[in-house]
Curated annotation (Swiss-Prot):
GO annotation, biological process: cell division; cell wall organization; peptidoglycan biosynthetic process; regulation of cell shape
Pfam families: Mur_ligase, Mur_ligase_C, Mur_ligase_M
Gene Ontology annotations for the cellular component aspect, listed alphabetically: cytoplasm
Protein known as: UDP-N-acetylmuramate--L-alanine ligase
EC class: ligase
Entry EC no(s): 6.3.2.8
Binding locations of ATP: 115-121
Cited InterPro entries: Mur-like_cat_sf, Mur_ligase_C, Mur_ligase_C_dom_sf, Mur_ligase_cen, Mur_ligase_N, MurCDEF_pg_biosynth, UDP-N-AcMur_Ala_ligase_MurC
Function comment: Cell wall formation.
Organism: Anaeromyxobacter dehalogenans (strain 2CP-C)
Length: 458
């Protein structure tokens, strides 16, 4: 305890280049801790951490943990990882990333954003609002926030804004003072087993709020609404529903922005604008409006903060335009995210949409095959590529070809399966001047956009 409090502890992260691990490592480095980490390959993230003073190793080896006091792992780290085995042999504590995040949050008032979709954007907006309001928050986000140039920020204020990860149940380790839930969809059932267990997990997460805290819940989402009777702490709701405590009306989708009127019950708070695409981002912004209002931040300050929000990398990021073809990249990989992103693309650009989609994980493809089958209706052309395994083993019946067959069966007229290495070339053959090309998925499909732009520039 004295080592951690005196900041003399040597903390090692296995898989430090991961988006969830790197943010915590960066905050600890900025606090003055000795931080080391390992990853399989060098990346922009590991280079950034090394530049901040982190000791980064490539490859996993027992000698990486010989001089450390604690080892931090994510759920992606296998039990037989040599660093984990050596740490346990030496009786060095091995803890999940959420436990380390919780230790940082104990020093602050925690604002934790959870949900199946939209939590990275909402977390980023919330951190930006608190910064704009002069509260100088610490933030750990599951994506690179453009205004921070990173997925983490160390602040001197009393608040810490974090993205809460439900995928492995680890959000039940963190102590939020304010909890926001954007939505709850059946996802990560490899961990939760049943949708009801997932729902119960969110109830437990919200009930971790202290008696003086607050839960901010999206009443528009039926599963979120269903947890209201089980929540034992103070709740405010938000959404388009007339039953919402904070309500959005007159939503306008125009180009790269969404505008709407916000109300606190029957009191008008004003018209707000955020430079994000898609109706769903009106609700993400509304959650932040509710947060600001409940914290006593004037609506005018919130309006200015949302208007100046610069977004998050890989959340509808325009990668470039060549020969009249615009290339956009997005992280969406769940059917609900895919559907919302494609709808937003069509509404914002009003062009023909060519979608390059890479399924993420065999389990997700298998479990959500039926939902994926109807998620691509707003794509005029769909190029499907190989499943990004994310460490999983192949599952019979869960392939890109199986997914393409399901999408065609539900009526899509233009679906083609293309190997990842040939994706950019295949896209070049299909596009026309004026098209919007959307690379979509949580894997390395993000690189296909620059590859296509390079081909178009030749």
């Amino acid at each position: 305890m004295s080592l951690f409090r005196s900041r003399q502890a040597k903390i090692h992260f296995v898989g430090v280049g991961g988006i969830g691990m790197s943010g915590i490592a960066e905050v600890l480095l900025n606090l003055g801790y000795t931080v080391s980490g390992s990853d399989l390959r060098e990346s922009e993230t590991t280079r950034r951490l090394a530049g901040l003073g982190g000791h980064i190793s490539y490859g996993h080896a027992a000698e990486n943990v010989l001089q450390v006091d604690v080892v931090v792992i994510s759920s992606a780290v296998k039990r037989d990882n040599p660093e984990v085995l050596e740490a346990r042999r030496r009786k060095i504590p091995v803890i999940p990333r959420a436990e380390m995040l919780a230790e940082l949050m104990r020093l602050k008032y925690g604002v934790a954003i959870a949900g199946s979709h939209g939590k990275t954007t909402t977390t980023s907006m919330a951190a930006h609002l608190l910064a704009h309001a002069g509260l100088d928050p610490t933030a750990v986000v599951g994506g690179k926030v453009n205004a921070f140039g990173s997925n983490a920020k160390l602040g001197k204020g009393d608040y810490m804004v974090v993205e809460a990860d439900e995928s492995d149940g680890s959000f039940l380790r963190i102590p939020p003072t304010i909890a926001i839930v954007t939505n709850i969809d059946p996802e990560h059932l490899d961990h939760w087993k049943t949708p009801d267990a997932l729902r119960r997990g969110f109830v437990d997460f919200v009930n971790r709020v202290p008696f003086y805290g607050l839960a901010i819940l999206c009443i528009d989402h039926p599963t979120v609404q269903s947890i209201l009777p089980d929540v034992e702490k103070r709740v405010v709701t938000y959404g388009e529903s007339h039953q919402a405590d904070y309500r959005a009306e007159a939503i306008e989708l125009s180009g790269h922005a969404v505008r709407f009127d916000a109300f606190r019950r029957d009191e008008a708070l004003g018209r707000f604008e955020v430079a994000m695409v898609g109706r769903h981002n009106a609700l993400n912004a509304l959650a932040v409006i509710a947060l600001g209002d409940e914290m006593g931040i004037p609506p005018l300050v919130t309006r200015e903060a949302l208007r100046s929000f610069q977004g998050v990398q890989r959340r509808f990021t325009v990668r470039g335009e060549v020969a009249g073809v615009t290339v956009v990249d997005d992280y969406g990989h769940h059917p609900a995210e895919v559907k919302a992103t494609l709808q937003g693309a069509r509404e914002a650009f009003k062009r023909r949409v060519v979608c390059l989609f890479q399924p993420h994980r065999y389990t997700r493809t298998r479990d959500l095959m039926a939902e994926f089958a109807t998620a691509f209706n707003d794509a005029d052309v769909l190029l499907l590529t190989d499943i990004y395994a994310a460490g999983e083993e192949p599952i019979p019946g869960a392939t890109a070809a199986n997914l393409a067959e399901a999408i065609r069966a539900w009526g899509h007229r233009d679906v083609t399966v293309v190997p990842r290495a040939e994706l950019a070339r295949a896209a070049r053959e299909r596009i026309r001047p004026g098209d919007l090309v959307l690379t979509l998925g949580a894997g390395d499909v993000t690189a296909a956009g620059p590859e296509l732009l390079a081909l178009l520039e030749r």
